[in-house]
């Protein structure tokens, strides 16, 4: 089980630091352990919500559209905490999660507040066919979008076969951070979806390693993302690796932290070779 010394740390923004923004309506936090995920309650950030003591890990969920999405809950019987990814499209203001009672009945609501954040804009020049899609490319994109939505819905307890002793992430590839999370993207003068990960510039063929133990849940070649691998690290914590030149794993393979499993490339919609690294919590890309 995850101990109170566990960390959720990554160069994609999930850094072990004291909470920066405390929930407005949640009860006071239990005594802080040595490390915690950074709590920054803004669109694209992470909320850290105390659930109180319980003999077993509570079941918590958040409403996304018409779906109740399960949440990552860490801690022990002394005090549990829900780690909530906040969508980039989240409106500032009050938000809440639901905690399901063990014996049934009405869920308990835990409220928190989302503060506004303005992300910068980035203008890029790419191949026109990746901006103004042909009917064939549009149909391909829609098929791939639906497939990856199923991948992103993955929620397992121990995908690597054992509980993680630590969630401390390592950098998957050395290199310069060439593009940040949340940038409002403008391709060839046309606004598109915000950037949902971190870009790390590196030469084609540079090995990429797993930041945590996990299981491969998807390997594919996609229109926008190019060569892509998804890893499942448990309880809705997924990582994504895009624009790859080679993918040396298959679905179901189990990786340990530091295992090389793919290589940097320039496939899909890109301006040059790099790794697009995404981190997802509760089906939400986070910084």
Feature roles, as predicted:
Residues 29-176, 180:
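Non-catalytic extracellular/periplasmic "stalk"
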Residues 9, 16-20, 186:
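A generic secondary-structure boundary signal that marks alpha-helix termini
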Residues 15-16, 75:
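Short amphipathic alpha-helical segments with coiled-coil-like heptad repeat character
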Residues 1-15:
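N-terminal secretory signal peptides and thylakoid transit peptides that target proteins
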């Amino acid at each position: 089980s995850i101990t109170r010394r566990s960390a959720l740390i990554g160069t994609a923004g999930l850094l072990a630091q004291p909470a920066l923004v405390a929930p407005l309506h949640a009860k006071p936090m239990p005594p802080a352990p040595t490390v915690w995920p950074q709590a920054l309650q803004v669109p694209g950030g992470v909320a850290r919500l105390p659930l109180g003591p319980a003999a077993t890990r509570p079941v918590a969920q958040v409403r996304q559209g018409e779906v109740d999405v399960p949440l990552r809950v860490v801690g022990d019987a002394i005090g549990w905490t829900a780690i909530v990814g906040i969508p980039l499209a989240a409106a500032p203001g009050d938000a809440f999660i639901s905690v399901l009672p063990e014996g049934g009945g009405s869920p308990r609501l835990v409220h928190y507040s989302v503060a506004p954040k303005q992300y910068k804009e980035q203008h890029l020049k790419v191949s026109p066919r990746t901006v103004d899609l042909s009917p064939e490319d549009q149909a391909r994109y829609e098929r791939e979008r639906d497939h990856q939505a199923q991948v992103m819905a993955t929620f397992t307890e121990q995908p690597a076969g054992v509980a993680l002793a630590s969630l401390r992430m390592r950098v998957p590839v050395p290199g310069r951070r060439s593009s940040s999370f949340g940038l409002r993207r403008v391709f060839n003068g046309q606004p598109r979806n915000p950037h949902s990960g971190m870009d790390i510039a590196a030469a084609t063929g540079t090995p990429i390693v797993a930041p945590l133990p996990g299981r491969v849940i998807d390997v594919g070649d996609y229109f926008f993302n190019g060569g892509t691998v998804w890893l499942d690290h448990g309880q809705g914590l997924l990582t994504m690796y895009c624009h790859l030149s080679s993918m040396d794993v298959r679905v179901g393979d189990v990786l340990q932290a530091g295992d090389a499993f793919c290589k940097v490339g320039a496939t899909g919609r890109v301006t040059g070779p790099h790794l697009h690294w995404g981190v997802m919590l509760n089906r939400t890309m986070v910084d």
